[in-house]
Amino acid sequence: MAKRLNIVEEKFLDTIKNNNLINSGDKIVVGVSGGPDSLTLLTLLNKYKSKFNYEIIVAHVNHLIRKDSTDDEQFVENYCKKNGIKFYCKRVNVQEIAKQQKKGEEEVGRNERYKFFDEICEKENANKIAIAHNMNDNAETMILNLIRGTGLNGLEGIQPSQYNNRFIRPLINCNRNEIEDFCKENNLEPRIDSTNKENIYKRNIIRNKLIPFLKELNPNIIETLSRTSVIIAENNEFIQKEAQKNFNKITELKSNLVEIDLKDFNKMPIAMRKAIIQLSIDKLNGNIRNISKKNIDDIIKLAENNIGNKYIIYKNIKAEVKKGKLKIQINERQIENSN
């Protein structure tokens, strides 16, 4: 009788199958810090690469924050040498960059990691990036986004794949305890980031203080939030598809300008109008980060009033009404004033 697979291994395989994350011939860059999550991901991807006919390459970013970060780097490199896996490493002074850019270390670290993963993808002609996010990460992200203030996109949390399977997350349905048990059962000795216990980042406070409190109210809060994120993602997918259909019907997209026919636009439900505005900005700007609910509401109000020669400027985005059309434009240089 065949040995029953560990729950993490079962979920790993189910997530790949149900979301079509990996195909034969894929070349996958795996982000590996050396911690329990990424070591588990690497171990499983390495185990199944021959069976599913894909190739893996490891990318490790040393943030130079912790004293033992060089040991983490060496640990991952040794694992790759032992298993015959191509290894790339980049050392980045995250604290220095954060000071220069006046951003948080967590944000800068994430940006630098993803930038490096993209670089290795291009260098190796890889088509996918595997990230070791788990179910707990998803719950923390949902709560963090809710605290910041967010719409449906933020409440989706972390999905199994992103950008047409450019990013894949085979462990997203595994919780942290399951992953730690997998490491013990398979005699893996992952690196432990001591800063995870320090409440120096918002995410750590959510992880170490808020979630334990929520577990007193609902012991299965991690799984509950995971199910909720799936429901929200399914509903949001429908809205986004409908928004794209309506966008195609009532807008004209130019290089740095979207023109929206207000006659049809103003008849649509408010949720659809907001989705079309967000889609317009995303198509022009490449993202909708830092665009608040108030910014969207102001543009909606501008469109409803439909008074010519009125406009709103937010950073590099200008919205104005002219001749029955709402025009949303991206300016190359950032404009700080508003009308």
Question: Model features per residue range: what roles?
Answer:
Residues 2-211:
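Core alpha/beta nucleotide-donor-binding catalytic domains of modification enzymes
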Residues 6-37, 54-57, 61, 92, ...:
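AMP-forming adenylation/ATP pyrophosphatase catalytic core
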Residues 177-178, 220, 294:
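Cytosolic histidine kinase catalytic core of two-component systems
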Residues 194, 214, 284-285:
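Short amphipathic alpha-helical interaction patches enriched in hydrophobic/aromatic residues
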Residues 197-203, 222-233:
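Internal, active-site/partner-interface "lid" segment
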Residues 206-225:
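Conserved anion/nucleotide-ligand pocket segment
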